[in-house]
Design a protein with these regions (language model features):
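A short, well-ordered alpha-helix in the C-terminal region of glycosyltransferases
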Residues: 368, 375, 382-397, 406-409
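Nucleotide-sugar-dependent
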Residues: 242, 298-305, 310-331, 341-350
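Conserved donor-binding/catalytic core segment of Leloir-type glycosyltransferases
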Residues: 12, 202, 221-242, 248-251, ...
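N-terminal subdomain of nucleotide-sugar transferases
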Residues: 1-63, 174, 254-256
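Conserved acidic donor-binding segment of nucleotide-sugar-dependent glycosyltransferases
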Residues: 354-366, 375-380
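Carbohydrate-associated surface elements
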Residues: 181, 200-201
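Membrane-proximal helix-turn-helix segments that form the acceptor-binding/catalytic region
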Residues: 119-122, 126-130, 143, 155-175
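Nucleotide-activated donor-binding/catalytic signature segment of Leloir-type glycosyltransferases, i.e.
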Residues: 267, 275-303
Length: 416
């Protein structure tokens, strides 16, 4: 990877994700890397553990270029189910050695770390700090505000996040955060001009239609119900923080007005709230016949589901998690040009207006969410008009090339 002509540095993005398939974190780093490259700056993904699409047997594709993005996996030391072990720590150390070697060989690198658990990733942080390699932690949520850790592993991880919260503002070159709330939070720990707000990113290419094989079960389900029912889509963890209990109650209210509706859900419930528990609640509410769980689906399948949805939901609860973060899926939803109901949390109202580009409901309020659902289906042509406005506004304020350019300028300023 040679140094770009437009700037005199390369950007190494470090994140422990399933690449190129994966969930929100994979989408984050992929679109950022693409945006950086589109701005004529070299970028590379460095990924500790796992392997291409999680296939640990195929070591021949652990380094290469995927959709213009150079990537390199560090998985010499095998691990189990992507969990923290001594071997995964050794993989992290290998990345630290790689960064140090590049610096010794004359590469002028800037490091962005998406994985900010200090216990697990401190070799990378300390290598950058001791060798004066600029590095920018990238935070998309206030991790220490997460719900109380239950397992030993999650308690250890929470300790790592707390250490990062204390140490990284003191030793990093700057911070990249997803919301103004997070900027305000970290401004108590470091100068404001060293904090860049980089919100969700969108790519207009994501609005292009996705096709699945005819024998794909997801496609068969969607095709058999499209135009017969209102397909209302929720994707997430099914937890309180994502407002799922309120969505269920709101959906039940909607069925009195628009009975030919199906709540289509995807995602991975937590082990503390398994799908069996969710289905039990759905059954008790009397909406089981209008509920469909499709499981944890692939990214192209998720895009297909979203593009064929009649309504998409992002109804987070009013919590520290929601207010300091920004739902990445909102950007993906906006690219579908389909109506969206979100709740009034965090920075959403800063960018999108209710009844103009999106439908906004009160958080933790099933009645408010239900009223918005009814509004959408009572005048669906108007709802589609609002959704198209949302698409255009997203391209204006979240475009990945423009926002990546702003981030590059922020980095350049903080290298002076």
């Amino acid at each position: 990877m040679e140094t770009s002509q437009s700037v005199n540095f390369n950007i190494l993005i470090i994140s422990d994700v399933d690449f190129p398939e994966g969930m929100a974190a994979t989408a984050h780093i992929t679109i950022l890397a693409k945006g950086i490259i589109k701005n004529s700056v070299n970028a590379m993904l460095l990924i500790p553990s796992s392997s291409f699409n999680g296939d640990t047997e195929k070591y021949d594709i652990n380094e290469g270029i995927h959709e213009e993005i150079p990537y390199k996996f560090f998985n010499k030391h095998g691990i189990v189910n992507n969990k923290f072990t001594f071997n995964s720590y050794r993989n992290v150390k290998d990345i630290a050695k790689y960064i140090k070697k590049r610096e010794k060989n004359g590469f002028n690198d800037v490091v962005i770390t998406y994985c900010n658990d200090f216990l697990k990733y401190h070799p990378i942080f300390l290598t950058c700090y001791s060798h004066k390699i600029p590095f920018f932690p990238w935070e998309v949520e206030k991790r220490i505000s997460s719900s109380e850790a239950k397992s030993f592993r999650s308690k250890l991880q929470m300790l790592g996040f707390r250490l990062s919260d204390i140490i990284l503002p003191k030793i990093s070159t700057g911070f990249i955060v997803i919301s103004t709330y997070l900027k305000q939070y970290y401004s108590n720990k470091m100068p404001q001009d060293k904090i860049c707000v980089s919100p969700i990113l969108v790519n207009s290419d994501d609005s292009l239609s996705v096709q699945l094989q005819e024998n794909n079960k997801i496609k068969q389900f969607i095709d058999s119900n499209k135009n017969k029912f209102n397909l209302i889509v929720y994707s997430g963890s099914f937890g309180e923080k994502d407002g799922f209990p309120y969505i269920l109650d709101a959906f039940k209210k909607l069925l009195f007005h628009h009975p030919k509706s199906i709540l289509v859900t995807t995602g991975k419930p937590s082990k503390y709230n398994p799908i069996e528990n969710i289905l039990k609640i759905v059954n008790e509410l009397g909406i089981i016949d209008n509920f469909k769980y499709l499981g944890l689906v692939k990214r192209d399948e998720l895009k297909f589901i979203n593009q064929n949805a009649d309504l998409l939901l992002v109804c987070r609860s009013n919590s520290e998690f929601a207010n300091h973060g920004f739902p990445w899926k909102l950007g993906e939803y906006l690219m579908t040009k389909n109506p969206i109901i979100a709740t009034k949390v965090g920075d959403i109202e800063t960018y999108l207006q209710d009844n103009k580009e999106i439908f906004l409901a009160e958080p933790e309020n099933a009645e408010s969410i239900a009223n918005k659902m009814i509004q959408v289906f009572d005048d669906y042509d108007k709802a589609k008009e609002i959704a198209n406005n949302g698409y255009l506004k997203a391209l204006e304020v979240f475009d990945y090339v423009k926002k990546s350019k702003e981030l590059i300028e922020f980095i350049k300023i903080n290298l002076k």
